[in-house]
């Protein structure tokens, strides 16, 4: 069964976050020789399939998995949930259609195409040495993500089944398949700053303290400011204001306060603590309150790591393209793997139609991606 056939079947399930719609039963049917773990909460479902190939004859699989001699454990990871399709599609978003070399359907790029490719590669993998292959899937990546991959990894830690390496099949490529590998991601800090003033009548400014005037004096040091210089793989961390609110909507009353909502996408050089210190310095002697919350931490996998090297080699061999290693974009479930010390990268199809009307993936991409993933498995098992 090839990547196209599997992807078509996956698209046919209307798995809008966090609905699973029975898709895991189909996936489990493809892997009768794999062991299964499932967990979930609040309507979220997660599936983990795993198999030890070529275990020593004098060890049961479960016992062998817990010993110091356990083989390399590699995991393919992804999500089967999709965002709502909306209206104005040329065809039913959950009835896959092939047209002019493309497969159309919600999730074709994000990320049922990637999942279909690694499921097919896993089915065709037949190593000659001991190797533990696993597949981790969740129905909650597009949503809050609280009970998705993060929860499953916690369960795997309890069972001593955490992988050594993982590829998350996010749609990472920009123009051609193979042009981009995500070897890390920026962190995200959300903040709320309230500058306080004294409300009053605009005709008596001497009796007021307008917090908007206060904001104007420090705005150049807050809005769009770079918090560090970045490095080879990370852009400079930047503070971005996303919302401002002040006043009652009347034209003759100065506001009592102004609320500034902001976000900082940041590299390893900036932390919540360093951002707090910076803002405290900028706002020194001003009346304010500040709230900061880190929603995700930055991470990076070494550019010379075994996983990165094997993936690069197979991309060059199959796609005839040298991938750019980068950390651009938003957050992904790869951060949950990194938090457990797992060597993780992201690689998948082109992302030009993700979350869009008439989402589609090239048939050639699916074919090549399956070959890349199979090559990675073979390369790691032979190392």
UniProtKB/Swiss-Prot annotation:
UniProt-annotated catalytic positions: 81, 141
CDD domains cross-referenced by the UniProt entry: M20_DapE_proteobac
Top enzyme category: hydrolase
Alphabetic keyword roster: Amino-acid biosynthesis, Cobalt, Diaminopimelate biosynthesis, Hydrolase, Lysine biosynthesis, Metal-binding, Zinc
Bound cofactor: record note: Binds 2 Zn(2+) or Co(2+) ions per subunit.
GO biological process, one term: L-arginine biosynthetic process
Transcription is among the record's keywords: no
Family note: Belongs to the peptidase M20A family. DapE subfamily.
Function: Catalyzes the hydrolysis of N-succinyl-L,L-diaminopimelic acid (SDAP), forming succinate and LL-2,6-diaminopimelate (DAP), an intermediate involved in the bacterial biosynthesis of lysine and meso-diaminopimelic acid, an essential component of bacterial cell walls.
Protein name: Succinyl-diaminopimelate desuccinylase
Gene of this entry: dapE
């Amino acid at each position: 069964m090839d990547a196209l056939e599997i992807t078509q079947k996956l698209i046919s399930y209307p798995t809008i976050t966090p609905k699973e719609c029975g898709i895991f039963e189909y996936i489990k049917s493809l892997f009768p020789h794999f062991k299964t773990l499932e967990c979930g909460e609040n309507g979220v479902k997660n599936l983990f399939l795993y198999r030890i190939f070529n275990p020593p004859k004098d060890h049961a699989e479960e016992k062998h998995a817990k010993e110091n001699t356990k083989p390399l454990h590699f995991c393919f990871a992804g999500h089967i949930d999709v965002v709502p399709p909306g209206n104005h599609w040329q065809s039913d978003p959950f009835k896959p259609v092939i047209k002019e070399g493309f497969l159309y359907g919600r999730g074709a790029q994000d990320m049922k195409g990637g999942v279909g490719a690694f499921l097919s590669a896993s089915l065709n993998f037949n190593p000659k040495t001991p190797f533990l292959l696993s597949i981790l899937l969740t129905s909650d990546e597009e949503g809050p993500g609280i009970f998705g991959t993060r929860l499953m990894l916690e369960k795997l830690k309890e069972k001593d089944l955490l992988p050594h390496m993982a590829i998350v099949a996010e749609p990472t490529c920009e123009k051609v398949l193979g042009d981009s590998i995500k070897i890390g991601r920026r962190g995200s800090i959300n903040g709320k700053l309230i500058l306080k003033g004294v409300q009053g009548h605009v005709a008596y400014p001497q009796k007021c303290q307008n917090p908007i005037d206060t904001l104007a004096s420090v705005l150049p040091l807050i809005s769009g400011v770079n918090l560090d210089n970045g490095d080879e793989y990370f852009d400079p961390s930047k503070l971005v204001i996303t919302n401002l609110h002040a006043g009652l909507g009347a034209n003759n009353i100065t506001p009592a306060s102004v609320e500034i909502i902001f976000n900082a996408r940041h590299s390893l050089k900036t932390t919540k603590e360093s951002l707090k210190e910076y803002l405290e310095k900028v706002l020194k002697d001003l009346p304010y309150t500040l709230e900061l919350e880190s929603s995700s931490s930055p991470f990076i996998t070494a550019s010379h790591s075994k996983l990165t090297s094997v993936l690069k080699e197979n991309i060059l061999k199959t796609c005839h393209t040298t991938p750019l290693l980068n950390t651009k974009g938003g957050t992904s479930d790869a951060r949950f793997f990194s938090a457990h010390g797992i060597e993780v990268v992201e690689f998948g199809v082109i992302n030009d139609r993700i979350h869009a009307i008439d989402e589609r993936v090239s048939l050639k991409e699916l074919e090549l991606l399956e070959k890349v993933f199979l090559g990675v498995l073979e390369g790691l098992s032979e190392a």
